[in-house]
């Protein structure tokens, strides 16, 4: 069911109706429910991946504060294990801190807006195979963007601890993608995404452009 998306299906007469066939979509929707512990209807188009619980904790803390803010577009937080948080929920962070999410291989949290333009965070755990699996299944939802957040494992001489490192390369020694994308084909960075993250860093930090360039590395 991935032939169209992988660019290996070349129709002679009829064009496909979508990127994935119906069986592939149904299978992936079921897998998303299983892996993340949340309804597929709650997934938002802006997806973050992480494998560190501290990023989950910060996302939950910030999400709960947004739900309580009357000027915020966010109306609810859907959490792995069937937990649903709104402005009326008492002690929301305590409700989320139970162990329900640990029952799922790649638990998810969805910060939902009324128009469905919110943010989803998925804790993908450790390993490139997990990352590929969740991306394969999320692809049927056609999200606007997905980003991996984590921390850098090494520093150049020009970098210092605390710098924001925007990764734009992938060392393919894990061979996870070899079957669909041979290693001799490079995976380029997306300039539009890099520029958007740079502009967002400048806006949130309040630092002038030259100072941001000293702290943000690619």
Could you describe each region identified by the protein language model?
Residues 1-145, 153-218:
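Accessory terminal and edge-of-domain segments that mediate assembly/interaction
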């Amino acid at each position: 069911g991935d032939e169209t998306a992988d660019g290996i299906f070349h129709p002679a007469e009829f064009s496909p109706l979508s990127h994935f066939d119906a069986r592939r979509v149904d299978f992936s929707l079921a897998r998303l429910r299983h892996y993340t512990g949340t309804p597929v209807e709650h997934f938002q188009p802006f997806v973050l991946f992480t494998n560190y619980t501290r990023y989950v904790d910060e996302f939950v803390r910030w999400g709960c504060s947004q739900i309580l803010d009357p000027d915020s577009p966010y109306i609810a937080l859907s959490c792995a294990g069937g937990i649903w948080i709104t402005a009326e929920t008492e002690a929301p962070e305590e409700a989320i801190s139970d162990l329900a999410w640990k029952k799922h291989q790649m638990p998810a949290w969805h910060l939902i807006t009324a128009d469905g333009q919110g943010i989803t965070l998925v804790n993908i755990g450790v390993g490139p195979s997990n990352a590929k699996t969740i991306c394969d299944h999320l692809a049927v939802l056609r999200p606007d963007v997905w980003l991996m957040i984590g921390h850098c494992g090494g520093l150049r001489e020009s970098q210092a601890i605390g710098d924001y490192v925007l990764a734009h390369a992938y060392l393919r020694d894990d061979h996870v993608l070899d079957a669909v994308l041979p290693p001799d084909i490079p995976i380029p960075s997306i300039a539009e995404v890099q520029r958007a993250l740079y502009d967002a860093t400048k806006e949130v930090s309040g630092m002038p452009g030259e100072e941001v360039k000293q702290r943000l590395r690619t």
